[in-house]
């Protein structure tokens, strides 16, 4: 499954009171996603593995407010590794105020195959771009 989304992100500094008022107002216009809906407390677990190079290009571009930047990450939604049936490959690119996010769900087994063998069993446009960006910037999974 492939998901593509373009949006504008504007960020504002809010007081606690403004935040809670805004959050309450938004509830009238939003629906819970399947993860929140199935969760007993209305919250769910998200684990992200970011890709960057050894100079921390992505991290530094974010800190410096670079207007054109890219973020590559792998996400899963279960605390225990063996409970994850899939992971989400996410490519997030910023062009000024415009944010473009491409995402593709792949099985955990297929992602582990890629990690162990250096290539994918199959390809789609998100996987192709994931490979291209990682090669261009020498990205690899980064933990700190």
Located regions from the model:
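Phosphate-end processing signature that detects enzymes handling 5′-triphosphorylated RNA
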Residues: 1-144
